Amino acid sequence: HYIFYYEKYLRAGKMGIPLGVFSGSTLPRNVEAYYEATISNDLFLEGLSAVQDFFNGNHFNSSTQGESLASYLDALNTLKNGEDLSTLINDQFNTAKNMVLDLSAFRAEIENSNPPTSMLLAYDEVQKAVPMLKVDMVSAMSISIDFVDADGD
């Protein structure tokens, strides 16, 4: 559910769909909290922080840190192009976070820019983490992903 949340709810739901990445035209009314237009970025950033905290084993509402996906990748000594994979993933999360921090409210970005280039560039940075999580991380851990939901789950 972790990768599914990141890819479908955070990346696609909060950014990609309103940006029109999947439909070809922007859908500003699909921005989260459309009528409270100034908080969409905060909601996105909160979700991204939760994803990164989970990745790093940071406990909710606490300074406690435990075992994590990052610590497992580190224990496996997982490298990508000679660099530590957990560091690359964290760096990508940070890059995406910084790009979103530089944006106006999502609704304003979409409604006032045609195309909303700055937000599309931020979306691209969010997207770059998907193959790192979905391909590199799960491959290193020798696990498979199945997003099919079956009866009896």
Model regions: which residues?
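Mature extracytoplasmic or organellar-lumen-exposed domains after removal of signal/transit peptides
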Residues: 1-153
